[in-house]
Amino acid sequence: LPLTLFPYTTLFRSSKVEQKEKIRRIMKSPSDNKELINKFQISITYPSAYEIFKDTVNFLWMQKPILKGHMNIIAYTLPLNTLKGIIKKRIPAIRDSIGRVYIPGRLPGSYMITEKAYRPYFFKTQIKGNLTYLTKGTWEVANDFMAGPFINYMVRDTSKNRWIVLEGFTFAPSISKRDYMFELNTILGSVKFK
């Protein structure tokens, strides 16, 4: 039994070390978080290389250019009663409706959705003591040929009767996205309520 656990504990330790290193690098040039604090009363630790791409009443989209693509962080809020019903069906439906309104594709009539061919992975967890639904999957653009990985955190904020939704997604065709998604996961997991 100890031999079968050894590789997993080593992997867990190396992931924690890698996460600490990622945070150290981010802290070399951190963002001031003013948009997130003013709009949603939250902060996350992310590098200043991310710039505001779209800012509306209840939606913020930040983007960082990378080799052959871009990394994206979006944030918005939803009322607490939004997740009634089967959560595994509601979260993709919410993502798709947000994509239709706020995240257009390159072509007219195209927009980001949750890929239908592969079911996302769902996890129930906590961030700083707050119930959180974590979803990992693949996004695609309806009516176009673009796709990539996403990670979505829906964090319950009972003090303000809402869900804070933080999502990271990457567009980088034909290259590995592992390190990009690791960075986005580290950033989103750093959320703090103000």
Model-derived segments and spans:
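A short acidic/glycine-rich loop-to-helix N-cap element
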Residues: 164-187
